[in-house]
């Protein structure tokens, strides 16, 4: 694995907080131990998700073939990055198979528990009593719930309405905008 100076780590953590694309690459390097072989579509996916985060896009469909990192980027990393900015956010992840949804939720949870993530987002913590893979919470009652398409979602809401002006990030990033529940 690459060794970085403390100054480089601090600079990288700041950049990862601000730039979702850099966050994905930085977390991959620090959790997998080698550089991510990224391609143009990875940047496009990250840019599209940033438009969702900023509230510029209300619905997004990502159509790329299997094994092209869309789940790693749009589910695991995006939930982790958004929870880093708003630890009280609520996410529901549904997949065709409950086992896959649970695995993705677990990967996100493990990312939040990792040292590299805590260097980027030191104030976002998983609750100590939240060890389930498919339904877990942050220390400030944010949550991730995972289910298969035949799973039960009744009673599990996601998203929070926020005042965008009062929750600006570093004066340059607007708050997350959640899809309406009717979507």
Regions found by a protein language model. Name each.
Residues 57-77:
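Walker A/P-loop
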Residues 94-150:
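Conserved nucleotide-state-sensing and coupling region of NTP-binding domains
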Residues 138, 153-165:
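Short basic/glycine-enriched coil/helix segment immediately N-terminal to the Walker B
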Residues 46-50, 72-84:
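Contiguous, well-ordered alpha-helical segments that form the cores/surfaces of helical PPI scaffolds
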Residues 165-171:
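Conserved small/polar residues in nucleotide/adenosyl-binding loops
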